[in-house]
Amino acid sequence: MSGVKDKMLVGERFRRALCSYPESAVVQEAMARELVSMVRLHAGEERLGRVLEIGAGSGLLTELLLEAFPVASLTANDLVGECREPLREIARRLRIAEFSFLKGDIEECGELPGSQDLVVSNATLQWLNDLDKLFAAVRRSLVPGKLFAFTSFTVGNMEEIAMLGGGGLSYRTTEEIGEIAGRHFELLELKESREQLTFSSPREVLGHIRQTGVNGLGGERWSRSRYLDFMENYSRLFRVQGGVSLTYRPLYCVLRRREL
């Protein structure tokens, strides 16, 4: 089973990064844009009455989705309660008639709001422990024939950090996610990509990770010697033109609830 045990630590890291996330999360923003394009491809231009977003965070996907589709009602979920007001403001500005916020770990929220026309999630599901259980809950929440569209990360994500023992998730493979999804949905599209960012130094890499909250693992403090070893080895092993690399492995998936 993949995922993470200490959700409180994950929430605290994202809470600290809430203000810096929109500017720093360049890969996650690109993922959100691609996901909206995929939803448009499979859903067309139909009006979406009720939408549920899992792990809405600062609202990167929220805003792009609400700008692209007419939506009557939005339920936004996040582990971090402080996300409520920024998300409410996005909904107000884009004239969404109904907005509600579902605070907490989506795996502990019980039955999800029903009669949804779309369920979406961007860069969140890698933190969850039981995708099979979540997918079953999402299927029950959707109107038959409607879509569940999400992004996550797959094996090899932030491989530089993992190789140096800097902490990281045990990511599911794309094949594993497809197999779990197929138990509950019709699989419309599943793909992955590789995105490499370049930073001037390993120190900048760590700053980027901190500003996006994705260092939600590993609560221990590093000693000075471990920190210096990390910097030296990162510079030596992951040097590219213009600096050092950090590699993301995004995954994109669109599913449809089968008709009754």
UniProtKB/Swiss-Prot annotation:
Pathway: Cofactor biosynthesis; biotin biosynthesis
Keywords in alphabetical order: Biotin biosynthesis, Methyltransferase, S-adenosyl-L-methionine, Transferase
Xref: Pfam families: Methyltransf_11 (PF08241)
Gene Ontology MF: a single term: carboxyl-O-methyltransferase activity
NCBIfam families reported for this sequence: BioC (TIGR02072)
Coiled-coil blocks: none
Keyword 4Fe-4S: no
Keyword Amino-acid biosynthesis in record: no
Catalytic reactions on record: malonyl-[ACP] + S-adenosyl-L-methionine = malonyl-[ACP] methyl ester + S-adenosyl-L-homocysteine
Organism: Chlorobium phaeovibrioides (strain DSM 265 / 1930)
Top-level taxonomic group: Bacteria
Stated name of the protein: Malonyl-[acyl-carrier protein] O-methyltransferase
Matching SUPFAM superfamilies: S-adenosyl-L-methionine-dependent methyltransferases
Biological processes, Gene Ontology terms: biotin biosynthetic process; methylation
Gene from which the chain derives: bioC
EC numbers, comma separated: 2.1.1.197
Major enzyme class: transferase
Family of this protein: Belongs to the methyltransferase superfamily.
Physiological role: Converts the free carboxyl group of a malonyl-thioester to its methyl ester by transfer of a methyl group from S-adenosyl-L-methionine (SAM). It allows to synthesize pimeloyl-ACP via the fatty acid synthetic pathway.
